[in-house]
């Protein structure tokens, strides 16, 4: 890990800890999780590593090997407004964790991603990796679902991405040689083991040459479009429905979908 090498060169000591969060792949889940659908996915052996040590003065100082500009802030006084850089994910994580727990200890170190940014949930991985280290130095233990929801809140409420919980769930709950099956409405999940009858396999991941960030994409617009569709379908069916913000495609019965598909098909003819 290059982050460990750089850490030793910079601080002239072994790191106090090395945090890791894997990237994820998802055969089924894009724009399904934020509509409270059922998804599946698995973690891979690539991800975010961070070599770090605690800082008793409560300051976070992190250098990324993937982005310019060092992150620096007090864990007890996170800026209310995002700054528009990669460290917003760290600030958001600290702010959400700090709303539930008293944070006194900061940390300093080096963070790196092992693959190009975008497409493998790198933003969620950064948040969870940082949260793991921040919890460690502050003596905080988060249960898996609490870690997932804290990381999700950091993206939703601070970074400004209206994501669901697909990425965080795959990264926290996945197990080697298993497929995660998750119902994002009630958070029930199952880890499905690889069948003994299944032939050995590998997952190929291709880099398109383009790097992206959800906060700079039309991701939030896509979610609003899904909500608008659900709102219209429920109104068409004469169903009782909640506010626009609390409407999801999961709330629409299958028979309503099928009836509307039949209607649109007839109209097209």
Regions found by a protein language model. Name each.
Residues 89, 129, 225, 264:
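Charged catalytic carboxylate motif
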Residues 125-127:
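FabD-like malonyl-/acyl-CoA
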Residues 97, 155, 230-234, 268:
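Generic helix-packing signal
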Residues 1-121, 131-145, 149-159, 163, ...:
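ATP-binding N-lobe of GHMP and related small-molecule kinases
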Residues 122, 166, 268:
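Single, functionally critical "micro-switch" positions that shape active/binding sites
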Residues 263-269:
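Conserved small/polar residues in nucleotide/adenosyl-binding loops
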Residues 162-262:
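Acidic-enriched catalytic cores of C-N bond-cleaving enzymes acting on peptides and small amides
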């Amino acid at each position: 890990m290059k982050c460990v090498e750089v850490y030793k060169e910079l601080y002239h000591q072994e790191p106090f800890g090395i945090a890791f969060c894997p990237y994820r792949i998802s055969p089924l889940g894009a724009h399904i999780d934020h509509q409270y659908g059922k998804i599946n996915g698995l973690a891979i052996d690539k991800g975010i590593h961070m070599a770090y040590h605690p800082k008793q003065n409560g300051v976070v100082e992190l250098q990324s090997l993937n982005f310019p500009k060092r992150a620096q802030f007090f864990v007890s006084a996170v800026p209310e407004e995002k700054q528009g850089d990669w460290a917003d994910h760290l600030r958001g994580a600290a702010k959400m964790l700090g709303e539930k727990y008293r944070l006194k200890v900061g940390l300093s170190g080096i963070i790196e991603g092992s693959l190009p940014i975008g497409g493998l949930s790198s933003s969620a991985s950064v948040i969870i990796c940082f949260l793991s280290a921040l919890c460690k130095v502050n003596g905080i233990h988060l249960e898996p679902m609490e870690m997932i929801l804290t990381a999700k809140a950091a993206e939703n409420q601070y970074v400004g991405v209206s994501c669901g919980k697909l990425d965080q769930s795959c990264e926290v709950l996945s197990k080697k040689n298993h497929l995660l099956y998750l119902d994002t409405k009630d958070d029930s999940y199952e880890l499905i083991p690889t069948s003994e009858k299944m032939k050995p396999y590998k997952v190929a991941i291709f880099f398109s040459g383009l790097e992206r960030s959800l906060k700079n994409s039309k991701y939030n617009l896509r979610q609003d479009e899904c909500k608008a569709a659900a709102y219209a379908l429920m109104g068409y069916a004469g169903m009782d429905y909640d506010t626009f913000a609390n409407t999801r495609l999961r709330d629409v019965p299958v028979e309503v979908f099928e009836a509307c598909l039949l209607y649109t098909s007839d109209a097209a003819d």
